[in-house]
Amino acid sequence: MSVAEMFSDFVANLAIGNTETISTRYGELTSALNKQFRDTESKTANTLQVGSFGRKTGINGISDLDMLYIMPKTKWGDYNKAGGQLSLLQDAKEAILKRYPTTKVKVDRLVVTVTYTNFHVEVQPVFEQGDQSYLYPDTKNGGSWKTTKPPAEMTAVADMDVQKNANLRPLCKMA
């Protein structure tokens, strides 16, 4: 076996083995939130898979998953007030508990953490801005809004991977 073949085998062994389960969980979480905030049960609309799974740099055994749930713009006024950040996270938690009543779901400072047997998902409700950035809640010191730009990050990783002959993502998986 050549070095190139051994390297390919090594990289293949890093591939996430439970992507179907992860995708199902993402879909169910999205559906629960869409049902609560939009009166639809779509499993794909209004969500972004972010973090290493979203960038396609995650490895087998990944246990920390991240997703953004894009809130309807019409809800901004409901949450852009004193204590609104915590209320948003609590409302997202309650929506998730309707779908997963026996699953451990808790509000953290910035996210709602949903703990499954082999991994957990950090759900971050966000409000989309015009420049592909998102405002997310921070409950510290009474609450504020912070900015994140995951689409730009994911695009940068994808572009660099193309420039590096599809070697960047495999290298990230080894780090």
What function would you assign to each model-found segment?
Residues 38, 97, 101-102:
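Residue-level recognition of short, structured coil/turn motifs
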Residues 1-62, 73-85:
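N-terminal regions immediately upstream of nucleotidyltransferase
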Residues 81, 85, 89, 164-171:
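Short, charged, low-complexity patches
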Residues 86-99:
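A gly/proline- and charged-residue-enriched helix-loop-helix capping module
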Residues 68-70:
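Short hydrophobic/aromatic beta-strand micro-patches
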Residues 61-65, 117-119:
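A short, glycine/Asx- and small/polar-enriched loop/turn
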Residues 23, 30, 101, 106-175:
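Catalytic cores of NTP-dependent nucleotidyl/adenyl transfer enzymes across multiple folds
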